[in-house]
Amino acid sequence: MKIPFFDRNKMLLKKYSKIVEKIKRREERFSKMSNQELINVALEFRKISDPQNHIEDIFAMVRVAAKRTLGMYPFDVQLIGALVLNDGKIAEMKTGEGKTLVATMPLFFNALFGKGVHLVTVNDYLARRDALWMGPLYLFLGMRVGVINQLGKSYEVVWKNQELYEKAISDNLSIWPEDYKNEFLKESAKDRKAVEAFEVELIEITRKEAYVCDITYGTNNEFGFDYLRDNLVFQFDDKVQRGHFYAIVDEVDSILIDEARTPLIISGPSREGASVYRRFASIAKKMSKDIDFTVDEKSRTIILTDKGIEKSEKLLQVDNLYDPSNVSSVYHLLNALKALHLFKKDVDYVVMNQEVVIVDEFTGRLLPGRRYSGGLHQAIEAKEGVPVKEESVTYATITFQNYFKMYEKLAGMTGTAKTEEEEFKQLYDLEVVVIPTHKPMIRKDHDDLIYRTQAEKYTAVVNDVVERYKKGQPVLIGTTSIEKSELLSTMLKKAGIPHQVLNAKYHEKEAEIIAQAGQKGAVTIATNMAGRGTDIKLGEGVADLGGLCIIGTERHESRRIDNQLRGRSGRQGDPGESRFYLSLEDDLLRIFGADQLEKVMNVLKIKPGEPIEHPLLTKLVETVQKRVEGINFSIRKHLMEMDTVLDVQRNSIYSYRDWILSGKVSQYIDEAIEDFVERRIEEFCDGSEWNLEGLKNSLSVLPKDVVSIDSQKFDSEGQMKDFLIRSIKDAYERKRQEIGDEYDQFLKFLILRIIDDNWRQYLEEVDHVKEAVNLRVYGQRDPMIEFKKETFALFDEMIARINEIVVSWMLRVVKVDSKKAEQEAKSGLSNLQLVHEEFNIVNRSERRKLHKNEKIKKRFKVKR
């Protein structure tokens, strides 16, 4: 409940400001120490049992050490940001306010607990850059720093020249000269000897060693995939992560919100043939938009009409399209139609070297190796006429929401979080604290200019750029797709304006290009937020020209993404300006609000090429964005609710695996035998009438000599149960003695393989259930409750199936080769790949169409 006139942000800032004053008072003591004394104190702090009682001293020490080793002195507002992160909250700090430095204090503090801490960022480049940049500070204070990158590459930060470093310690060198009094240390004023002595580099190490380091830098994807891979291993020692204690998520809005609809998936090839996808691609082309189906761009779904259903049945030669036996046909048809009408070349993906490569919708980067799951990627390949690769089968999956919820303490930092504070609170229980800027923000944010057509809009953008280029003012133009960035580039070339294009096709140089975007006369086109995390410093004389000008060519679905673009200008009190150029043909306005604006333009008799501009119109656009944000929030919440159900089951399966990996095979076998027997007693011996024939048939999965109930008499269910359990356990013990020591080792690999195969099959079934339960909303049933009931029933079936297979197979083993068993168990993991999933929620219209088919069975059953 919000209390009127109560500003919690102000209250928190006041609280943290008091702690900052204490830190500053403690700092004097540390600033008088020599380098060696400071190092010794840091070592002493590692021995204390509760660092929380020494937080002011620890932060003061890190502040002094940063000045000496990095030539950077954290401001008071940066100390506030560090305290916010240390309390497990989100610090909103504007671009250029030094978030990288802010993170060092809470990272060092929490690393003192000895459990390992993680700094999570959005790409490999930033992980390496920030670890190297802050590395001298951590190494000076006795911390090991690791970096994890894609393709299994891992590094440790080490001193470049150990001898020079040791001399710098004994000679008490500092990068920041004692007589330098300004708050920023200029490059020219740094002590060159100290700079050279405190240089670091990366050396390659194993993945496991990177996690053993006190502080580990890496991307959200790599941390998540390492967790999933750890739960596919066949030896406990092959696990690389050592737990989830404390993490700071850099660009937290990008990772926990923008990418929250994108589950991490480890998948492998399926048996579905390429010809199936080509067939459905051909059928999709015979279907007419708005007659056979409608396209809902808001929820990215295709809805078949009654005519479309009839036409599909004729084309597929089936009586009832929605009969359960035709589920896969519906699945393929909808995917083929989505590929044709919802996924656009050079916007959602590009075709390179006969391959479909996904474009990240938030950063504009290419994602080679990533594939849409559920057959969608293959449908796009069939549409584009490139070789169709096998459909992927899910081996392991987790959403970022549930991965990051595993951390005992989670914090985040970004320049834009306030607009999403409700979502952070509801989904992650994370509070947003807005940190004041070190210097006042003086950037001018102009009202939007709205044109009738995109052609008029782009012409106006080019004219604006030409005028600013003539006077030397740098311009950064933000676009929403590769296609649009290349269109603008062509127009600027015709106008004779030299410029740089920064998008998915050139991302290797993006940090270098974006860093130069503030130089005099620079014109840069950037796809969305490519180059995020890199500061744009103004060149000489640029401040007098008005600073960096940001031009947005389209409003994003989220106000936050627009604010990120604006935030590239006006860093640390620099001048700057921003403006968005829009048109009624832009996706956001076309889908959600063009009609109202069209009426306004007609009333005002706006001529072709003329824009309308008014603060009320800018607010109207923001209102449209709020509506879209609400829709997207609901989708993310729905995804999280579904994955939370899965999370309980995933934890249960992974706990089973860990139990078996740690050598508890015989204990697991005991449990499996008991479960195997109890289920049969419940089914065949419940009550006064026993179905002994049914029981005998169900026991036929065991070798004949294991158990016989023909000559036995039982007075109760308990007696029967005890007899069966004892008989099977005796057979297990005989088999152990017969085969010897290798038997349990062999069983370990066998059990893990059985668990993994069934879990993989279960995840595939859950994908179908997600679609199926949504059909039931018209039976006055809540899809979420139905999803829980359905998945719990399937999960219980899976556990029963696992135990039955284990119990029956373990007693049929004749000869054992545990090494061969391990190789066989691991063989399926060699072709695994990382998948970017397009998460689909069937909307009401589609469910209504499906519900018309009377032949749909009440229970959605997946063939096994």
UniProtKB/Swiss-Prot annotation:
Its EC number is 7.4.2.8. GO terms for biological process: intracellular protein transmembrane transport; protein import; protein targeting; protein transport by the Sec complex. It is a peripheral membrane protein. The keyword Secreted does not apply. It catalyses: ATP + H2O + cellular proteinSide 1 = ADP + phosphate + cellular proteinSide 2. Transmembrane segments: none annotated. Keywords: ATP-binding, Cell inner membrane, Cell membrane, Cytoplasm, Membrane, Nucleotide-binding, Protein transport, Translocase, Translocation, Transport. It comes from the Bacteria. Its main location: membrane. It is an enzyme of class 7 (translocase). ATP binds at Q78, G96, E97, G98, K99, T100, D535. One of its GO terms (molecular function) is ATP binding. Part of the Sec protein translocase complex. Interacts with the SecYEG preprotein conducting channel. Has a central role in coupling the hydrolysis of ATP to the transfer of proteins into and across the cell membrane, serving as an ATP-driven molecular motor driving the stepwise translocation of polypeptide chains across the membrane. Belongs to the SecA family. Monomer and homodimer. Part of the essential Sec protein translocation apparatus which comprises SecA, SecYEG and auxiliary proteins SecDF. Other proteins may also be involved. HAMAP family: SecA (MF_01382). This is Protein translocase subunit SecA. It comes from Pseudothermotoga lettingae (strain ATCC BAA-301 / DSM 14385 / NBRC 107922 / TMO) (Thermotoga lettingae).
